[in-house]
Amino acid sequence: MKNLTLVFGLVVSLFFLSCKENTTAQQIKLISPEEVYDAVRDNQNLQLVDVRTKDEFGEDHLKTAQNICVTDDDFKEKVAKLDKNEPIYVYCRSGKRSSNAAKILKEMGFKEIYDMEGGFLNWESQGLQEKN
């Protein structure tokens, strides 16, 4: 009887652990500007978030991006309105702020997080076109 209880407890524990793993991102994927370009080109409804300031975003940004600044106090409140079950792509100027944003998104339960390596500067150096 003790063994049966122990086995049942292990099965229940494994069930809850496996469910937890499916609800949050396993890792944040650092991807190249070319990979972001391909994703944006193939899906104009992509959750693409520029985490720079409003002023930086106003100077230039990727065509379909929305601006949610990671240093604003309401960052979590704003990103909470996005779909946690859909892939989300983030970028900033050089990659530091988007890395921080990606970590926050992971903590909030986003399942598929992509961080553009090198940020907007890297995008520009690659001569990619999907800019505003």
Feature-to-residue mapping (PLM):
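Rhodanese-like catalytic fold shared by cysteine-dependent sulfurtransferases
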Residues: 2-9, 16-39, 45-46, 55-87, ...
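Structural scaffold elements adjacent to functional motifs in cytosolic proteins
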Residues: 48-50
